[in-house]
Swiss-Prot record:
Function of the protein: Core subunit of the mitochondrial membrane respiratory chain NADH dehydrogenase (Complex I) which catalyzes electron transfer from NADH through the respiratory chain, using ubiquinone as an electron acceptor. Essential for the catalytic activity and assembly of complex I.
Protein name (database record): NADH-ubiquinone oxidoreductase chain 2
Gene designation: MT-ND2
Organism lineage string: Eukaryota, Metazoa, Chordata, Craniata, Vertebrata
Keywords, sorted A to Z: Electron transport, Membrane, Mitochondrion, Mitochondrion inner membrane, NAD, Respiratory chain, Translocase, Transmembrane, Transmembrane helix, Transport, Ubiquinone
Catalytic reaction(s) noted: a ubiquinone + NADH + 5 H(+)(in) = a ubiquinol + NAD(+) + 4 H(+)(out)
Location in the cell: Mitochondrion inner membrane
Subunit organization: Core subunit of respiratory chain NADH dehydrogenase (Complex I) which is composed of 45 different subunits. Interacts with TMEM242.
Membrane spanning stretches: 1-21, 25-45, 55-75, 96-116, 123-143, 145-165, 178-198, 199-219, 237-257, 274-294, 324-344
Length: 347
């Protein structure tokens, strides 16, 4: 990528997300989504190779299809209601089409097929942006229209996403695909509570971005893209060994780490609203996530001293620049749950 073009591309991505999130007019929201999509394609092809080109084409085809469905729903709703306001959806078919288009853009099941492939075909930094920043615009639209959404359809998408994200990561050895399936699961948790308490959705999204950013930065620093490369962490950067397992366990929602807090709030809110079966299913399926995270941790731990081969130690020769971002994110990833009672008002 041309260094001169990078500020233009990233500023366009930021502007597109900001326009969509702050707009109450359907056309402006749609324009923001299109700006975001078109500017993100060069980010996916940062390294020009057939795999990244394939990932960019898949991303474009899915996002363009979702945009066409969204525009069709917007126009049909405008013909029936005469309004362009995002919160004024009078036709249930338009509501269903809008929800379907947003689910495609978020990569929710059953429209999830593109997320692991696109994430695998790009770099770790581009994959981080795909799984974090690119979620903001569609979720901001969902946040605005949640009072008029079909709750049953949304919960169906959410439960399917949690199940597919958990089962899909079981047979993976590529870390980017595992994090992509983890993203599908987390999006399911975010949207499941949206009709009942959208503020918990925003909190869940914030925690998810912190956890995923920590995981991607650690893997990028370690140059690990597969389970095999992750198992050689001892020979490269020894100080990452406690960081990566704690981050993965937090992503899985294991107490007392930070990742347990949003799941706890979602289950509590769903239980308050009388939906006991749904949070039970969600909690049980999440154990599958913990299983394949534990498998990654096991593959890393068995290479610790003295069982590892210490003949070729690389960490003595690594000249790493110190950074404050990763330690700060690690603290937020692991230690936010103990201070959670301080953030909620007393009953």
């Amino acid at each position: 990528m041309n260094p001169l073009a990078q500020p233009i591309i990233y500023s366009t991505i930021f502007a597109g997300t900001l326009i969509t999130a702050s707009s109450s007019h359907w056309f402006l929201a749609w324009v923001g989504l299109e700006m975001n999509m078109l500017a993100f394609i060069p980010v996916l092809t940062k390294k020009m190779n057939p795999r990244s080109t394939e990932a960019a084409i898949k991303y474009f085809l899915v996002q363009a299809t979702a945009s066409m469905i969204l525009m069709m729903a917007i126009l049909s709703n405008n013909l029936l209601s005469g309004q362009w306001t995002t919160t004024n959806i009078t036709n249930q078919y338009s509501s269903l089409m809008i929800l379907t288009a947003l689910a495609m853009k978020l990569g929710m099941a059953p429209f999830h097929f593109w997320v692991p492939e696109v994430t695998q075909g790009t770099t770790l930094t581009s994959g981080l942006l795909l799984l974090t920043w690119q979620k903001l615009a569609p979720i901001s639209i969902m946040y605005q229209i949640f009072p008029v959404m079909n709750v049953n359809i949304l919960l169906t998408f959410s439960i399917l996403s949690i199940m597919v994200g958990s089962w899909g990561g079981l047979n993976q050895t590529q870390l980017r695909k595992i994090l992509a399936y983890s993203s599908i699961t987390h999006v399911g948790w975010m949207t499941a509570v949206l009709p009942y308490n959208p503020n918990i959705t925003i909190f869940n999204l914030t925690i998810y971005i912190v956890l995923t950013t920590t995981a991607f930065l650690a893997l990028n620093l370690n140059s690990s893209t597969t389970t095999l490369l992750l198992s050689r962490s001892w020979n490269k950067l020894t100080w990452l060994l406690p960081l990566i397992p704690s981050t993965l366990l937090s992503l899985g929602g294991l107490p007392p780490l930070t990742g347990f807090l949003p799941k706890w709030l979602v289950i509590e809110e769903l239980t308050k609203n009388g939906t006991l079966i749904i949070p039970t299913i969600m909690a049980i399926v999440t154990l599958i996530n913990l299983y394949f995270y534990m498998r990654l941790i096991y593959s890393t731990s068995i290479t610790l001293f003295p069982t590892s081969n210490n003949v070729k130690m690389k960490w003595q020769f690594e000249n790493m620049k110190p950074t404050l971002l990763l330690p700060t994110l690690t603290i937020l990833t692991t230690l936010l749950l103990p201070i959670a009672p301080l953030t909620f008002p007393a009953p």
